[in-house]
Amino acid sequence: MLLPAEIESKSLIPALRAILAKDLAKKHNIREDEISQMLGVTQAAVSNYIRGIRGDPKLIEKLLEEKQVASMITEITDNLASDNAYTPLSLSKFIGLCNYIKSSLLICDIHHNLESDIDEVVCKECENM
């Protein structure tokens, strides 16, 4: 059984970082080494995010289809690009995005893709978080 925090760390956060890295590189013309400092990862990780090696492409597509998620990601990207750094505000917005994904139960789809034999009683616990 995977805990919600494991799902976030193994699937959700890499997908979100991939989206942010691609947006920062393409929309804001920021170099990989600068993006790595903003996201707190290595330059190699940023390269992998941009090339699609890290971050599940299907999950990325699903996240971007959600208008609220896409809007929140744009806000974070614009904040990172304007400050050219990771700030308490961008951290707060990233946490808010993860919390939204959990509270809107989008995380359940991710969980079901990782584990197909989830007990429905256990699954319903996320609704109470």
In which residue ranges do the predicted regions lie?
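Short Lys/Arg-enriched helix C-cap and helix-to-coil transition segments
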Residues: P57-T74
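Short, amphipathic alpha-helical "recognition" segments used to contact nucleic acids or chromatin
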Residues: I13-I30
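Short, Lys/Arg-enriched anionic-surface-contact patches
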Residues: M1-R17
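C-terminal flanking helix
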Residues: I53-R54
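Helix-turn-helix/homeodomain-like alpha-helical modules used for DNA recognition
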Residues: S71-M129
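Short alpha-helical "recognition helix" segments of helix-turn-helix
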Residues: R31-Q37
